[in-house]
């Protein structure tokens, strides 16, 4: 993350946009699980940040401030659209087994992410995908670091349970299918 600094209206904001756009987009996309919605929400993040630039106080890096705006917009979007349990269909072209395994792992993790509330998903995304520390996540989300730690722990537990249940049902399904075929 960049260090805290004042936001100069035109030039610095353009530089900030260029520097932080991809990071903000990735964070939002990982929360909403929809690239088109993430694109719109990222644009809205920068519009709102530009309009509120006079209220920004440089106590934290501008990137953290932008992510906070973006994550809040993503959570609001999920609430409005009731998309918290929606996983977009993904088609992967897998030329070899390793690519197939990675695609399958992305699907499993993506499905497990849909079992999380938007607040838990935001904590997981910022920690594991963006590599932020608990303190940095706390600054982005506006909550204590202890709350971030408990959200991450709760999210990991839910995801483990979800993935475990899916693997058990796959095993049961393949065993029963084999029994039906006389195997």
Role assignments for model-derived ranges:
Residues 40-47, 60-72:
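Structural recognition of an alpha-helix C-terminal capping motif at a helix-to-coil junction
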Residues 2-26, 39, 50, 121:
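A short, charge-rich alpha-helical start-of-domain segment used by transcription regulators
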Residues 123-127:
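A short pre-motif secondary-structure segment
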Residues 77-104, 167-173:
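Short, basic/polar amphipathic helix motif occurring as a linker/hinge flanking DNA-binding modules
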Residues 16-35, 52, 113, 162-165:
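Amphipathic, Lys/Arg- and hydrophobic-enriched alpha-helical face
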Residues 24, 28, 53, 66, ...:
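Hydrophobic-face residues of short alpha-helical interaction/recognition segments
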């Amino acid at each position: 993350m960049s260090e805290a600094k004042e936001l100069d209206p035109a030039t610095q904001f353009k530089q900030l946009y260029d520097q932080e756009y991809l990071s903000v987009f990735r964070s939002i996309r990982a929360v909403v699980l929809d690239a088109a919605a993430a694109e719109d929400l990222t644009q809205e993040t920068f519009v709102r940040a530009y309009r509120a630039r006079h209220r920004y106080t440089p106590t934290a890096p501008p990137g953290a401030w932008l992510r906070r705006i973006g994550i809040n917009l993503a959570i609001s979007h999920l609430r409005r659209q009731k998309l918290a349990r929606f996983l977009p269909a993904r088609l992967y072209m897998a030329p070899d087994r390793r690519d197939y395994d990675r695609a399958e792992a992305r699907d499993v993790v993506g499905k497990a992410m849909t079992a999380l509330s938007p607040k838990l998903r935001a904590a997981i995304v910022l920690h594991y995908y963006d590599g932020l520390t608990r303190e940095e996540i706390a600054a982005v989300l506006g909550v204590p670091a202890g709350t971030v730690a408990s959200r991450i722990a709760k999210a990991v537990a839910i995801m483990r349970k979800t993935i475990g249940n899916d693997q058990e049902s796959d095993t049961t399904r393949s065993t029963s299918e084999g029994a039906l075929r006389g195997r």
